[in-house]
Design a protein with these regions (language model features):
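Conserved ABC ATPase "signature" region
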Residues: 138, 142, 149-167
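Conserved ABC transporter NBD signature motif
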Residues: 98-106, 114
Length: 351
């Protein structure tokens, strides 16, 4: 029983570990992946997934398809169901209804053959304090690879990929935060998973570490891993994901590439105007214009989403002048994922 509990804990920790190796931007090349090639079917297929926590509906008939080689983003606010969906896919949670297939095969708790092909990077970092860096990596790798000689080679590769040479005999408490993240990643990728789940991997890290994490994910993807990436950081998802899904309240609201999602909601250019003071009545007048889909005012900036971009700018400026609102710089910006999220859900997803 103790071994079973340890294995369960290790699977979860493997998630966070992958984060760390990602911090080693510009490090050694990601090792090539092992495992049978995927045979033309979706690597992840979820249909009609329902998960309840008492009266709370965490997943509401959730559907998902992820193809081999993608970096697929699950985008949504905290509580949108991203982590719940991943935990159901990994069989860490039971669910009330629906089906899950990974690698074209039904996923069940007993499918250890499928679990060996998966890596998990949870939001919270977790390693064994009593083990050294190398022992931690070897422990988690041993859950998937029994041959000691093969495992020794895999651990060597993971140490190099994570930039942990010289730290192999250190215990986690002696490592800096960045090195600890590298250890987490090394443990998660040592067995060379074909499918890797990253759950909010850049929460509470500095910008430099965040960039390194993203570069590490790119390296893994170039080496052949399919990546499932959850985040509520818009810029991150826009930068790294080849395709993404917008989630809210346990539902999949829209799926596509960045460009497809913007086209889906006709998220044209945003007009922005520096306005030191702007009365609520003027804002309501702008919202009443037929071509204005959205008007927000905050921090001295008026932000407008217009159906025709800047073509109706004259009408906007006329409203400002009618209310005696002094304005300065006027400029247009391309739409962002936050604009798409706002159009689809009616709320903003702020970093």
């Amino acid at each position: 029983m103790a071994n079973t509990m340890e294995a369960g804990r290790s699977a979860a920790t493997g998630d966070a570990r992958t984060k760390a190796a990602l911090e080693t931007a510009g490090g050694p090349r990601a090792p090539k992946l092992a495992g049978a090639p995927h045979e033309g079917r979706s690597i992840v297929a979820v249909d009609g997934l329902v998960k309840r926590y008492g009266e709370v509906l965490a997943l509401d008939h959730f559907n998902l398809r992820i193809e081999p080689g993608e970096v697929f983003g699950l985008l949504g606010p905290n509580g949108s169901g991203k982590t719940t969906a991943i935990n159901c896919m990994l069989q860490l949670l039971t669910f009330d209804k629906g089906t899950i297939e990974l690698f074209g095969e039904p996923m069940r708790p007993s499918r250890y053959d499928l679990k060996r092909r998966i890596g998990v990077v949870p939001q919270n970092v977790a390693v064994f304090e009593e083990l050294t860096v190398r022992e931690n990596i070897d422990y988690f790798c041993a859950l998937y690879v029994s041959d000691r000689a093969r495992r020794r080679d895999l651990v060597d590769e993971a140490v190099a990929f994570a930039g942990l040479e010289g730290y192999e005999r250190f215990r986690p408490r002696k490592l800096s935060g960045g090195l600890l993240r590298r250890l987490n990643i090394a443990c998660g990728i040592a067995h060379k998973p074909e499918l890797v789940f990253f759950d909010e991997p850049t929460v509470a890290v500095d910008p430099q570490s965040r960039n390194a994490i993203l570069e590490g994910i790119r390296q893994m993807n170039r080496a052949g891993s399919t990546v499932v990436y959850t985040s509520h950081y818009m810029e991150e998802v826009e930068e790294i994901c080849t395709r993404l899904m917008i989630m809210d309240r346990g539902r999949a609201l829209a799926t596509g590439t960045n460009a497809e999602l913007k086209a889906m909601v006709d998220a044209g250019e945003k007009i922005q105007v520096d306005v030191p003071e702007f009365p609520d009545a003027a804002l309501e007048r702008l919202r009443a214009l037929p071509h204005v889909r959205r008007a927000l005012y905050r921090d001295g900036v008026l932000e407008l989403a217009c159906a025709n971009g800047t073509h109706n700018l004259g009408d906007v400026l006329a409203v400002l002048q009618a209310f005696g609102a002094a304005f300065g710089r006027v400029w247009a910006e391309p739409p962002t994922l936050n604009d798409v999220f706002l159009e689809i859900t009616g709320t903003e997803l702020r970093d």
